[in-house]
Amino acid sequence: KVNHPIKYAWYDAMTYKYGRYHEDGLGDYNYQFMQKEGDKVPADQFFANFNWNKEKNDHSVEMAKWLERSQYDVFAGLELQQGGSYKTKVKWDALLDEKGKLRLSLGLFAPDTITSLGKTGEDYHKNEDIFFTGYQGDPTAQKPADKEWYGIANLVADRTPAVGRTFTTSFNTGHGRKWFVDGKVSKDSEWNYRSVSGVLPTWRWWQTSTGEKLRAEYDFTDAYNGGNSLKFSGDVAGKTDQDVNLYSTKLEVTEKTKLRVAHKGGKGSKVYMAFSTTPDYKFEDAAAWKELTLSDDWKNEEFDLSSLAGKTIYAVKLFFEHEGAVKDYQFNLGQLTITDNHQAPQAPTGLSVVKQSLKNAQEAEAVVQFSGNQDADFYEVYEKDGDNWRLLTGSSASTIYLPKVSRSANATGTTQELKVVAVGKNGLRSEAATASFNWGMTVQDTTLPRPLAENIVPGATVIGSTFPNTEGGEGIEGMLNGTITSLSDKWSSGQLSGSVDIRLT
């Protein structure tokens, strides 16, 4: 009805005439789902079932050509859930041509299986890097000889959302242990707000070095805005340098374009932010190199990029130059902004508490609503407790559920102030919209209930089972919902029934 460009994919499970059947590719009994009818096609993409091989892939390529369709409209399915993400056995020889190029597209079934391979957020990102970049941690390098997994970035060219004339990122992964605002802690507890995730580095991590490479990772203990920064650390030798390629971009530079960089640490070296103004990712334009003024505390620097007006920034990197050796070297990158829009977004309007539910005189749930604006990337909601503002949540929505509004035992009166700030697509914050939360009572009017014990059995273990062990990440131990075995509480088995022995604590 709104003419949204929806893409339709056909899963290789049905034939055109004879019912259910997996051909494991585009074949003689299912090609009709991809056959053109004038200028239209029944399906935009074809997802081949997982049991393909070289012969079946050859036939898929030939069938696509016969149908005058691209062979890359056919996706070779990878069963990542049962296989265990990057532990999945893949018949790469059946997928790659003599030049190492994919012959079909990749269809990733359940790539979120990564979550089952670790116990912490840091574990997740390490496994995510292996899945997408490979064990070698470099999309330009071949996989190690003793490993089977290539890494998706080794096979598929990079694409980027960093286009136009404005790009900003705080490298926010959408979760954290604290929330920082301009380098200061505003929420001192764990959170998970996926809608405020930032654009993460395109290449994690594409590095070259004349010495040992720096260790690159997300730092959840210190950030400039949001929950994490990028940390580069290690022992460095003198007379060495490091190239860390961060982003593929396509950013237009005007006379008003400026660079803002928030960073911390790095003393004992020279650190540059550099841009490639050619599509080949070469950094040969001297005007596109900006040396940072290093500081032990968070520093937000601004650079004029008008000398690059009329050019396009195709890539962004960090360059470290070490004259002398430094032990325990560390540099944190907290925020990166390239924009010619230096106007803060308009403040939200019409902020109100549309629903609330009191648990006691100090804790409540609520829903706030307001009118936002198109210049906002997301919104931060705060509560005032005494003289301090404390972050409640971050969200890209304009109707926001607040699971825990709270005030301290020494709060006075029956109302509490809330505020909402818009964070712009250029990284700037708006003025605040405020509203009053009416408790209808003072903190002395109720007592706090005794906290309920958590409904988990952290020491429970699976000690035996008639289900077979799985090579994937979703083994039988994952059936213990609520136990701390991984980031996933799913398990998978092809066996229809069986028994499990569990030891409780």
Which residue stretches match the model-derived regions?
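Disordered, acidic Ser/Thr/Pro-rich linker "stalks" and the adjacent N-terminal cap
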Residues: M441-L504
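Short carbohydrate-recognition loop motifs
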Residues: R215-Q242, D489
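Extracellular beta-strand ligand-recognition surfaces/modules
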Residues: V261, K299-L336, T505
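Extracellular fibronectin type III
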Residues: N426-T442
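Conserved aromatic anchor
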Residues: Q362-D375
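Substrate-binding cleft of secreted/luminal carbohydrate-active enzymes
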Residues: V74, L78-R215
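Extra-cytoplasmic beta-strand recognition segments
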Residues: L230, Q242-V271, E301-L305, L336, ...
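Beta-strand-rich modules
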Residues: P403-S430
